[in-house]
From Swiss-Prot:
Record's protein name: CASP-like protein 5C1
Keyword Protein biosynthesis annotated: no
Family: Belongs to the Casparian strip membrane proteins (CASP) family.
Membrane topology: Multi-pass membrane protein
Source organism per UniProt: Oryza sativa subsp. indica (Rice)
A GO term from the CC aspect: plasma membrane
Pfam family, one: CASP_dom
């Protein structure tokens, strides 16, 4: 048990992976909700990009969380090399896109705040800042998941 868990800590089909996936979905949903509350986000391409990417991360994370739950309940982790490579590539792509979306949104928010609120009311700018922060947290978890799965593939 200890050897199996150590080799698969954070890899698809483990409790660590389930925790990462649930947290990814929660932070991505929070980012999406904070951004979508303000109707004005359509005016900025970076904000639309963030909404689009968070909208992709949520179903990806939820689907892999369901696979993790199934693997934990059945007791047979899904460790097929081809599937693991697809998960790693998907995580890498979403991690890169999440970082790009969070960074560009944070830059636009910083620019809007430098104009002393003339282009963004403090209420909306605060929500946009929270959205970018949640997107960064989602990116961190997606990158960590990708690295755990890559480590598992390399250790085989």
């Amino acid at each position: 048990m200890e050897n199996r868990e150590r080799a698969g800590a954070g890899a698809v089909g483990s409790a660590g992976s389930l925790g990462l996936r649930v947290e990814q979905a929660v932070f991505s949903s929070a980012s999406l909700l904070f951004m979508s509350v303000g109707v004005e986000f359509f005016s900025y391409t970076a904000f639309c990009f963030l909404v689009t990417i968070m909208g992709l991360v949520i179903p990806w994370s939820c689907t892999l969380a369901m696979i993790d739950v199934y693997s934990i309940l059945v007791g047979c982790p899904l460790r097929v090399p081809g599937v693991m490579v697809i998960v790693v590539i998907g995580d890498w792509v979403l991690a890169i896109l999440s970082l790009a979306a969070a960074s560009s949104s944070a830059a636009v928010i910083d620019l809007l705040l430098q104009f002393h609120g003339s282009h963004c009311s403090p209420r909306f700018c605060g929500r946009y800042q929270l959205s970018a922060m949640m997107a960064f947290l989602s990116w961190f978890l997606t990158a960590a998941s990708s690295l755990f799965n890559l480590w598992f593939i390399a250790s085989r």
